[in-house]
Every structure is written in structure tokens, then in C-alpha cells.
Amino acid sequence: MQRITITLDDDLLETLDSLSQRRGYNNRSEAIRDILRSALAQEATQQHGTQGFAVLSYVYEHEKRDLASRIVSTQHHHHDLSVATLHVHINHDDCLEIAVLKGDMGDVQHFADDVIAQRGVRHGHLQCLPKED
């Protein structure tokens, strides 16, 4: 491990210290390492051809015209990416789905875009993790 020196604006340093405290980091170095790892992982997952894992979460109205069947159709069309799906009934109208995906990150992003773009899908979020060798 190497020791480096960085220069930060006062406002940015305040934000870093606040983040470190909220997340329970013992020091700034740990927080900066995690932030950097997260940024590098995100960049790696945006490269087509990169293999990895992802979690796609979204809320949808199950009574919306044919929405549930369109989502299922999209899932079946990309069956090779799906590892598991959790379905939660939030209330009478809304469902939360959490899909664990595995494969080429470009294909995973395409699948997520297909689902999130469906009319009636809200709060779509894709969290990607590159496969570590």
C-alpha cells in the first residue's frame, strides 16, 4: 500500500467527512478507497464484453394493461441472463421485483433498459458488479 497526498476543496472535504461518519468509516482513506473501487467497478461494467453480475430492481403496477405479461416476456427473451427473481407485493396495486442477473454487461444493460422503459415501471435501478478473476 502506498501513501499519497491529495488536495480537496473545503466543501468537498466536508462532504467526504460527513459521508465517512454516516457510513462508519474509521478514516478518510477507507472512504476514498471504497469510492474509488465503486467508480472503477461501474466503469468496468459499462464495457461491452465484460462479464459480471447485476441486481435489477423495479416497481410496477401489476394491473397496468398487459404490463406483467410484457415483463415476463422480456425476462423469457433474456432467460440466459437470469439467475433468480424475487417478487414482492407492496400493496394492492404495486409489485417490487428484484432480479439477479449474470452475463455480458452490455446484454444485462440492454435487458434492464427493456424492462425499465416499459410503461408503468417505476424506480428502476441497475447495480452492476464486474466478475473478478
Curated annotation (Swiss-Prot):
The keyword Transcription applies. Ni(2+) binds at residues 76, 87, 89, 95. InterPro entries: Acetolactate_synth/TF_NikR_C (IPR027271), ACT-like_dom_sf (IPR045865), Arc_rbn_hlx_hlx (IPR013321), CopG (IPR002145), CopG/NikR_regulator (IPR050192), Ni_resp_reg_NikR (IPR022988), Nickel_NikR_proteobac (IPR014160), Ribbon_hlx_hlx (IPR010985). The keyword Nucleotidyltransferase does not apply. GO terms for molecular function: DNA-binding transcription factor activity; nickel cation binding; sequence-specific DNA binding. Binds 1 nickel ion per subunit. Transmembrane segments: none annotated. Keywords: DNA-binding, Metal-binding, Nickel, Repressor, Transcription, Transcription regulation. One of its GO terms (biological process) is response to nickel cation. Its cofactor is Ni(2+). CDD domains: RHH_NikR_HicB-like. Belongs to the transcriptional regulatory CopG/NikR family. PANTHER family: NICKEL-RESPONSIVE REGULATOR. Homotetramer. Transcriptional repressor of the nikABCDE operon. Is active in the presence of excessive concentrations of intracellular nickel. This is Nickel-responsive regulator. It comes from Escherichia coli (strain SMS-3-5 / SECEC). The lineage of its organism: Bacteria, Pseudomonadati, Pseudomonadota, Gammaproteobacteria, Enterobacterales. The gene is nikR.
